[in-house]
């Protein structure tokens, strides 16, 4: 794992990005559904 220093694996980037996107979409949809999204 020493050769990956300073370089992030592509699968890790895609996994983290996908998780963040799904999480943010879920939060926004839940917020708008429960009426709290208007404050954002």
Curated annotation (Swiss-Prot):
Membrane topology: Single-pass membrane protein
Pfam short name (any one): PsbJ
Top-level taxon: Eukaryota
InterPro entries: PSII_PsbJ, PSII_PsbJ_sf
Entry's Gene Ontology cellular component terms: chloroplast thylakoid membrane; photosystem II reaction center
SUPFAM superfamilies: Photosystem II reaction center protein J, PsbJ
Keywords: Chloroplast, Membrane, Photosynthesis, Photosystem II, Plastid, Reaction center, Thylakoid, Transmembrane, Transmembrane helix
Segments traversing the membrane: 8-28
GO biological process entries: photosynthesis
Subcellular location: Plastid, Chloroplast thylakoid membrane
Record bears the keyword Transmembrane helix: yes
Keyword Membrane: yes
Assembly with partners or alone: PSII is composed of 1 copy each of membrane proteins PsbA, PsbB, PsbC, PsbD, PsbE, PsbF, PsbH, PsbI, PsbJ, PsbK, PsbL, PsbM, PsbT, PsbX, PsbY, PsbZ, Psb30/Ycf12, at least 3 peripheral proteins of the oxygen-evolving complex and a large number of cofactors. It forms dimeric complexes.
UniProt-listed NCBIfam families: PRK02565.1 (NF002722)
Function: One of the components of the core complex of photosystem II (PSII). PSII is a light-driven water:plastoquinone oxidoreductase that uses light energy to abstract electrons from H(2)O, generating O(2) and a proton gradient subsequently used for ATP formation. It consists of a core antenna complex that captures photons, and an electron transfer chain that converts photonic excitation into a charge separation.
Family as reported in the entry's similarity comment: Belongs to the PsbJ family.
Protein name: Photosystem II reaction center protein J
Organism per entry: Ginkgo biloba (Ginkgo)
